[in-house]
From Swiss-Prot:
Biological process annotations from GO: alkane catabolic process
Cofactors that this protein relies on: Fe(3+)
Protein name as catalogued: Rubredoxin 3
Rubredoxin-like domain: residues covered: 1-53
Pfam entry (one): Rubredoxin
Keyword Transmembrane helix part of the UniProt annotation: no
InterPro entries: Rubredoxin-like_dom, Rubredoxin_dom, Rubredoxin_ET, Rubredoxin_Fe_BS
Similarity field: Belongs to the rubredoxin family.
Lineage of the organism: Bacteria, Bacillati, Actinomycetota, Actinomycetes, Mycobacteriales
Alphabetic keyword roster: Electron transport, Iron, Metal-binding, Transport
Amino acid sequence: MSSYRCPVCEYVYDESKGAPREGFPAGTPWDAVPDDWCCPDCGVREKLDFEPMPATAGSES
């Protein structure tokens, strides 16, 4: 699974964890998150501004 980071506040959306408080349960793929979804921490960035994070050693893809 992949992770995506907000370039302003460093919030990370991790597909394996989802964002339950935003209505996205664990396992929700990034493609299923609406394009107009904003960062839940800073609220100023839309999904298209999030940056994919490189896979780390030991992570499952």
